[in-house]
Regions:
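Cell-envelope and extracellular/periplasmic
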Residues: 1-182
Length: 182
């Protein structure tokens, strides 16, 4: 394993060429890195430098759900931490979009079978970022979290008329934690 091996072999030779944008679908091998958001932001900046475009559209595919029946609370999951790090990197970096794939995961396979819906979501982000279609639907992302009495209220950007589950009903539960996992 060579950390820069793939970059040097596959991406570096393309530096200087013109590209319309980039899609990043992270592998699962370095799931436990707590500094992932900083690393991802550095990667985006490096690619933009290499391709000579400070506004290069960059789409990040968020890790899907995996192993539905888990002993861990969602906020304790390494995958939940990674998804949040992906969200933070996109939130803190201009000209980026997050493609949510949480609902496309499989309980028994790390790679989701439903590639069509994922591709449509990535394409919508590309339409929005790279081609200026401001009506293209983007993935919902949490915007604000606050307490109202005994309830916790979460507002989302890009949620249209609201969030729905696969069966068309409203979601009943969310797992929420602070940056310390509490």
């Amino acid at each position: 394993y060579q950390p820069a091996g793939l970059y040097n072999a596959l991406l570096a030779p393309l530096a200087g060429y013109t590209v319309k944008g980039a899609v990043w679908y992270q592998g699962e091998s370095s799931i436990d890195r707590r500094d992932y958001a900083q690393m991802l932001k550095a990667l985006i900046m490096k690619w933009r430098e290499d391709f000579g475009d400070k506004r290069l559209p960059f789409i990040v595919v968020q890790l899907p759900n995996f192993m539905k029946d888990s002993e861990e609370w969602p906020v304790e999951s390494q995958w939940a931490w990674r998804r949040d790090e992906q969200r933070l990197a996109v939130q803190q970096t201009k000209h980026t979009a997050l493609t949510v794939a949480l609902d496309l995961g499989e309980w028994n396979d790390i790679h989701p079978l439903n590639k069509k819906d994922l591709a449509q979501r990535v394409a919508a982000c590309a339409e929005y970022l790279a081609y200026g279609n401001k009506k293209a639907p983007l993935s919902p992302v949490p915007d604000k979290v606050y307490r109202r009495g005994k309830a916790v209220v979460i507002t989302f950007r890009h949620a249209g008329e609201g969030l729905l589950t696969k069966d068309g009903s409203e979601p009943l539960h969310f797992a929420v934690s602070d940056h310390k996992g509490i």
